[in-house]
């Protein structure tokens, strides 16, 4: 089993909502090819770390507003952008994200990410082909 599947199974069994963050989010979106020894997730559950097949699964508690009401893909995109940081988001990254998401996922992102930081939302608008004002 892959680490992401194990993390999702743990989250299900504990009734946590989880979203990949850090390099894990970048890997899952194809923005990084770096193999990570630690798979990181934000969670509405407690801080927890699990060791599994020489891989570490790390769950970091976050407030619900970073997780609740957001689809998996919207949360994943937001976490990836936050990991990169505003100054590291290039046109190439926006293009990669745009190609990775379906039209439905893009529409969900636009609707759901309105509460995120201004630069994150502006980036999502560009990714979805919206105007950038």
Regions found by a protein language model. Give the residues of each.
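Hydrophobic alpha-helical interaction segments
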Residues: 61-133
């Amino acid at each position: 089993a892959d680490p992401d599947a194990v993390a999702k199974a743990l989250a299900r069994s504990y009734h946590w909502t989880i979203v990949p963050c850090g390099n894990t989010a970048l890997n899952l979106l194809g923005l990084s090819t770096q193999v990570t020894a630690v798979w990181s997730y934000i969670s509405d559950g407690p801080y927890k770390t699990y060791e599994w097949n020489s891989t570490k699964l790390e769950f970091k508690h976050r407030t619900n507003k970073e997780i609740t009401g957001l689809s998996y893909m919207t949360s994943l995109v937001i976490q990836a952008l936050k990991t990169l940081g505003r100054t590291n988001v290039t046109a190439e990254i926006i293009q990669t994200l745009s190609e990775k998401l379906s039209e439905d996922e893009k529409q969900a992102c636009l609707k759901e990410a309105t509460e995120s930081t201004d630069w994150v939302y502006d980036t999502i608008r560009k990714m979805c082909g919206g105007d950038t004002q």
